[in-house]
Amino acid sequence: MTDSREYTYLYRHNKKINQVEMIYYFGVIIIVTKLILSYSEIISISPLFNNLLNLTFVFLMFLKVLCTFNLRIKKVHIIFALFVIMTVYTSIQIDNYIILFTALGIIALKGMNVKSIIRISYYVKIFWLTLHFFAFIFAIFCFPNSVQYSLIDNEVRYRIFLSQPNTCAMLFLWLIFEYMYLNYEKLSFSKFLISSLFFGVIIYLTKSKTSIIVYVLLWLLIWQNKRKCIKKLIGFFSKYGYIILSAFFAFVTVNYNNLSFSRILNTFLTGRLAGAAKTYSTNGFTLLGQYLELGKKIEWDPIYRVNSIWLENSYSMMFLNFGIVYAILIAIALWYASDYLTHKDKIFVCAMLIYGISESYIVNIFLCFPLLIVASAIYNKREYLKKNYNIDEARKGECYG
């Protein structure tokens, strides 16, 4: 009789857990769909529907938090509440709600399996990106005049109906990275060839240099991770890389006109440093966010040699747009999480940090997942390895060559 009652209790308890987890998973489907459609040129969503998706996601994350946390108020609840208030303030200031969505996604992570979250995100992206890719193939053969492209430095760059070439490449790159993360222990040379063939087509169309560099570097890190020096480098860079890169780019931004190498580096990064330096000269750094008219045409500046303002370097963007406070929080999180991350996790964190040099998407945990892993590792601490990745799996990840 006792065994029967215990079984009934466990069944109901597990059913409740699954229902609570489904709230988060549904939120992931909503936000990933919203983010991709916000870039789409073939599926236009109205501002009203966009706001509805935003509010639905926020509601689901709050519901998940209410279902997970104890109703007794603790210090951690107050900290989370203040964190949300801070991100709401920043989001209103900069007119961009990604920082709020990331904060809510992190707070609601308690008890979640991060691998399952990435898997859900992966399948949603597969659906939408496949739709756009085949729509592009159909259009390019049947209605070639309807396909728009960007002409940059005499290069024709297609965007596959996704806003702009770099954004398109980013979405496909992190889709492939999600596949690699989920199938890390099964990666092989044949899988490398297949993924490279597909991504090669994307790169041929978009001409995104950043994406191909990060893609190649990630595979090199995976292949060479048996070497002790590479392991140590990955561990060090995943822990301190954000601090080092933030300090470096802040220094270059402030002293752009006084450094002999700044213009050479700016040319290599296709104008990203000059844009940040120009923004700093007119707006300065910000603690909790400031509004910038990114993309706005300005009068030609002969000193910085820019005629529009773009912030595509993640580190500069944090200081100039989102706020120094968030850069500090990310740096602390990466440092603290290092003790809980597996070697596999650290490899993908390194890829994110390198990607952030040329692109500004890394703070969005639903497009670039490494910060989601970091947050989960901190949140669940030792349970992270026990529940999501057992020790044997972690060792397999280290031995893959």
Model-identified regions with their sequence ranges:
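A membrane-periplasm/extracellular boundary helix in multi-pass inner-membrane enzymes
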Residues: W223-L265
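Membrane-interfacial helix-loop-helix modules of multi-pass inner-membrane proteins that assemble, modify
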Residues: T130-P165, R263-I264, I303-V306
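Alpha-helical transmembrane segments of multi-pass inner-membrane proteins
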Residues: Y122-I140, S163-K207, I213-L220
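Hydrophobic transmembrane alpha-helices and their immediate junctions
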Residues: N321-L353, K381, N388
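Long extracytoplasmic/lumenal interhelical loops at the membrane interface
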Residues: L265-F322
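Transmembrane alpha-helices of multi-pass inner-membrane enzymes
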Residues: M352-L353, N364-G401
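N-terminal signal-anchor transmembrane segment
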Residues: T2-V65, A135, A351-Y355, F366-I373
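Transmembrane alpha-helical segments and their membrane-water interfaces
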Residues: M86-L129, I330-L334, Y340
